[in-house]
Amino acid sequence: MASETIVNLLDLDAEGLVAYCGGLGEKAFRAKQLQRWIHQYNAADFDGMTDLAKSLREKLKGRAVIGTPDILSDHVSADGTRKWLINVGNGNAVETVFIPEETRGTLCVSSQAGCAVNCRFCSTGKQGFSRNLSTGEIVGQLRMAEFALRASLGRAPGPNGKAERVITNVVMMGMGEPLLNYSAVVPAMRLMLDDNAYGLSRRRVTLSTSGVVPMMDRLGAELPVALAVSLHAPNDALRDELVPLNKKHPLRELMAACQRYLKVAPRDFITFEYCMLDGVNDTEAHARELLALTRDVPCKFNLIPFNPFPESGLLRSKTEQIKRFAQVLIDAGVVTTIRKTRGDDIDAACGQLAGAVKDRTRLAERTGATKIIEVRAV
């Protein structure tokens, strides 16, 4: 008789957990109890789940686990930004970054090891695509970070109330293109939103995409969360060069998809992310082109100073030029922000994720890895 497959319960959203418990002959309410123990009380095993029948706990011990990330490093920046490097096997590592602010705490989560989109200004794409992360590996980043942060503040695990939660916002802006890992990302986000798990609102969970148009439509139909689009260019010729996916889904299609998404979105605008590249996409003429491109899409712009990496052949736009570019947008009435660099002293700034593993040989020896992927968020 073949051995039974061990299930990582972090891979199951509420519906999946109900089905799993049903397969064990248990009622649906047991799934809610399990979910609360795992996602609200940070249970590491089944013994402490005291409101579950002992018979169920014994069943679970032989059939299921509560997976936890294999943390390779944990660093805190001078500005409070915290970065975890997580081993996801076969020499691959991804990073999770927490950015504290006065009124909120934002967690940047990865969805893939590597990335196939290969944007010109993004180091992750230069490393190639390795694999999709599982639902458990994605939501596990939130679980790990939330309870690590609570522990550092002396807060005990428990149901998420406003006074308890440390992470108030999640952005799917780490390594990878989330919409190319849709089947794992959506269940993970369902758990982020579930009141029996993390209880975040749809306005506080943001998915960032480079423009996978068919999956944008599917997300809008199934789980419309806040949406950010990695735009980076005001015309197809330049975007074809910077974001090769544009050749498959050009700007006309992308803008139409944004309009469709806004009909169901929890926010009344799309956030367009725009990496500022010196002499490439940063002139006032480019800004005016952007205004024409997006005139029918309610939006805000987030201008991102480029964080250079070796062999990119690109430079960060000068600060004064970024301000001039922003002013063109602001003068037209478009809300525009310039992203503040956070965590750059621990290589956790935008574009630096997992980009500073200084001694690869020692890290590989420690993890049994043959390679380490450098991760950079766009």
From Swiss-Prot:
Gene3D superfamilies noted in UniProt: 1.10.150.530, Aldolase class I
Positions of the catalytic residues: E95 (proton acceptor), C350 (s-methylcysteine intermediate)
Organism classification: Bacteria, Pseudomonadati, Pseudomonadota, Betaproteobacteria, Burkholderiales
Job of this protein: Specifically methylates position 2 of adenine 2503 in 23S rRNA and position 2 of adenine 37 in tRNAs. m2A2503 modification seems to play a crucial role in the proofreading step occurring at the peptidyl transferase center and thus would serve to optimize ribosomal fidelity.
Cystine residue pairs: C108-C350
Keywords: 4Fe-4S, Cytoplasm, Disulfide bond, Iron, Iron-sulfur, Metal-binding, Methyltransferase, rRNA processing, S-adenosyl-L-methionine, Transferase, tRNA processing
Cofactor comment text: Binds 1 [4Fe-4S] cluster. The cluster is coordinated with 3 cysteines and an exchangeable S-adenosyl-L-methionine.
GO aspect biological process, one term: tRNA methylation
Binding locations of S-adenosyl-L-methionine: G176, E177, S208, S230, L231, H232, N307
Subcellular location: Cytoplasm
Residues of the Radical SAM core domain: 101-345
EC number: 2.1.1.192
Protein name as annotated: Dual-specificity RNA methyltransferase RlmN
Keyword Cytoplasm set for record: yes
Additional comment: Reaction proceeds by a ping-pong mechanism involving intermediate methylation of a conserved cysteine residue.
Binding site for [4Fe-4S] cluster: C115, C119, C122
Entry's family note: Belongs to the radical SAM superfamily. RlmN family.
Reactions accelerated catalytically: adenosine(2503) in 23S rRNA + 2 reduced [2Fe-2S]-[ferredoxin] + 2 S-adenosyl-L-methionine = 2-methyladenosine(2503) in 23S rRNA + 5'-deoxyadenosine + L-methionine + 2 oxidized [2Fe-2S]-[ferredoxin] + S-adenosyl-L-homocysteine; adenosine(37) in tRNA + 2 reduced [2Fe-2S]-[ferredoxin] + 2 S-adenosyl-L-methionine = 2-methyladenosine(37) in tRNA + 5'-deoxyadenosine + L-methionine + 2 oxidized [2Fe-2S]-[ferredoxin] + S-adenosyl-L-homocysteine
Cofactor: [4Fe-4S] cluster
EC category: transferase
Cell membrane among keywords: no
GO cellular component terms, semicolon-separated: cytoplasm
GO molecular function: 4 iron, 4 sulfur cluster binding; metal ion binding; rRNA (adenine(2503)-C2-)-methyltransferase activity; rRNA binding; tRNA (adenine(37)-C2)-methyltransferase activity; tRNA binding
